[in-house]
């Protein structure tokens, strides 16, 4: 387990000798895809990104979009040879770019680790990093499976969980999503698994009385959510001090690496021992 995690870290920080790839001018229209380019040692090829991407502010990188709204004119001016986006990006803008002869690749939001890995490898293939992408994807799957097996072996399955994404309105992770898969992969029961939508009432959570609550947010934004739950001392997760935090910039930007690392943190918070 530690060897696999070390491999992931080494790959991310460049301890592997990565194969050279043809230089490209890439525009990324999704934070998760930008993060993937960093993991594939292709950050230097990014010429444009969204204001929410980790490359925003980097020298030589132009911010040409928000989370969903893009500026086709600004993108064209960058003369990219590859534009990568998700289905969250306004499709009419992407069609405009395609009609101008630009290469645009759209990825839908992955709902499982396998889908996330497949997209990661596809991206790697497009930028000449298929071998590196495959290695990272396979290592992430090994980590995830190892955590699953050890959670079961240590008798840590069967607990109920709320994974909270927002507080106003209160929103929980449902089934059919990669975050929902993370919950069940660790052998836990998602109290929102069968809900048609993630918007919750506080009363629903109190009735469900989860053993654990994982709060996803950015930095200090998580503290008010934690304090609000602490105002319900009879709630099992509060009574047992089972309120845990997850960083939104990592969990909400799905890549094989962020999935595996977030899963490992959750497993340890759930009591997994090395």
Predicted feature locations:
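Positively charged n-region of N-terminal signal peptides that target proteins for export
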Residues: 1-4
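Bacterial N-terminal signal peptides
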Residues: 6-16
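Boundary at the C-terminal end of the N-terminal hydrophobic targeting segment
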Residues: 18-21
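Basic- and aromatic-lined ligand-binding clefts that recognize polyanionic substrates
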Residues: 24-37, 131-187
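Structured C-terminal subdomain patch of bacterial secreted/periplasmic proteins
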Residues: 24-25, 115-125, 134, 138, ...
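A short, structured surface patch at a secondary-structure boundary
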Residues: 24-89
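His/Asp/Glu-enriched short active-site or ligand-binding loop at hydrolase and phosphoryl-transfer sites
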Residues: 50, 176-198, 245
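Proline-aspartate-enriched helix->loop->beta-strand connector
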Residues: 70-88, 102, 201-215
